[in-house]
């Protein structure tokens, strides 16, 4: 099997919440694409709820783009501990943290979930505003760091 960057990370030595630049790729035409690990909860200790994580995905899709022009995608991790963000350009981790703090703060102000209907969402019933707010609040209270390894 090809070496996968995320499998090389020692998950026993990280301290969530954090943002980590997981890699940069340069395409054949010179396009730069960055990938970030937005870790919300501690691997192998905590999980984001399915409904809360799905709702956060909907909010982050919009709010992160309010602060970052070159977002390609934000996707939930299969391990349910955070999200991956991909963007064009070599963006600084501090800019991602600032956008994420802004986005999670905006989640706390919301009263309805964007695109939570069968026309716009493939799992429209798998949402919870309450759980999304709870996850956002927890991450903000714990503070998002750019230092991800425990010393």
Swiss-Prot record:
The similarity annotation says: Belongs to the LuxS family.
Reaction catalysis annotation: S-(5-deoxy-D-ribos-5-yl)-L-homocysteine = (S)-4,5-dihydroxypentane-2,3-dione + L-homocysteine
Q: How is the cofactor bound, in the record's words?
A: Binds 1 Fe cation per subunit.
Lipid biosynthesis as UniProt keyword: no
**InterPro entries (alphabetical):** LuxS_sf, Metalloenz_LuxS/M16, S-ribosylhomocysteinase
**GO process annotations (BP):** quorum sensing
* Listed cofactors: Fe cation
Which proteins does it associate with, and in what oligomeric form?
Answer: Homodimer.
Query: Top enzyme class of this protein?
Result: lyase
What the protein does comes down to: Involved in the synthesis of autoinducer 2 (AI-2) which is secreted by bacteria and is used to communicate both the cell density and the metabolic potential of the environment. The regulation of gene expression in response to changes in cell density is called quorum sensing. Catalyzes the transformation of S-ribosylhomocysteine (RHC) to homocysteine (HC) and 4,5-dihydroxy-2,3-pentadione (DPD).
Residue sites binding Fe cation per the record: 54, 58, 121
Keyword annotations of the record: Autoinducer synthesis, Iron, Lyase, Metal-binding, Quorum sensing
Q: Does the keyword Lyase apply?
A: yes
Query: Per its record, how is this protein called by name?
Result: S-ribosylhomocysteine lyase
Q: Which GO terms describe its molecular function?
A: iron ion binding; S-ribosylhomocysteine lyase activity
Give the EC number: 4.4.1.21
Which PANTHER family does the UniProt entry name for this protein?
Answer: S-RIBOSYLHOMOCYSTEINE LYASE
